[in-house]
Amino acid sequence: MKIDGTVTTGLGKAAYFLSQDFYVNNFKKNCGFRPYPGTLNVIVPEEYLPQINKVKNECKNIIKPDEGFGAVKYIKARLNDEVTGAIVFPAKTTHEENYLEFIAKDKLRDKLNLEDGDTVSVEF
């Protein structure tokens, strides 16, 4: 599935969670990279929500961390046909349903010169 979406500013909470060893070590082991401590937030059209929710609900990749932290489902993905990473689905989130959170080894706003309002494609 390939979806175009719009880059938006997140809440800034992912940096803390993606700095925790149990998340970092799991992503490194299972996705092949140490994630940059932050996500690229992408708003996708609501028409894709049924397919996204199906993927999320059927996802078997899950990190179950220490007590006090939420579980995270993830699927490997590509951004703009050039960056390999993953989409994360945190069990505890305050984002709307049509937000995708993309992680990669680099700070994607800098690497791809992205700003709020830019269009990106996410494939998973």
UniProtKB/Swiss-Prot annotation:
| A Gene Ontology BP annotation from the UniProt entry | riboflavin biosynthetic process
The catalytic activity of this protein is classed by the Enzyme Commission as: 2.7.1.161
Q: Which positions are annotated as binding CDP?
A: 10-15, 106-109
Has the keyword Transferase been applied to this entry? yes
- Give a GO molecular function annotation for the protein: magnesium ion binding
Cofactor(s) named in the record:
Mg(2+)
Annotated catalysed reactions: riboflavin + CTP = CDP + FMN + H(+)
Q: What superkingdom does the record give?
A: Archaea
Q: Which residues bind FMN?
A: 93, 101
Record pathway: Cofactor biosynthesis; FMN biosynthesis; FMN from riboflavin (CTP route): step 1/1
What does the Swiss-Prot or TrEMBL cofactor note state?
A: Binds 1 Mg(2+) ion per subunit.
**Which of UniProt's keywords are assigned here?**
Flavoprotein, FMN, Kinase, Magnesium, Metal-binding, Nucleotide-binding, Transferase
Name the residues that bind Mg(2+): 39, 41
| PANTHER family membership | RIBOFLAVIN KINASE (PTHR40706:SF1)
Assigned protein family: Belongs to the archaeal riboflavin kinase family.
The task this protein performs is described as: Catalyzes the CTP-dependent phosphorylation of riboflavin (vitamin B2) to form flavin mononucleotide (FMN).
Q: What is this protein called?
A: Riboflavin kinase
Q: Which organism is it from?
A: Methanobrevibacter smithii (strain ATCC 35061 / DSM 861 / OCM 144 / PS)
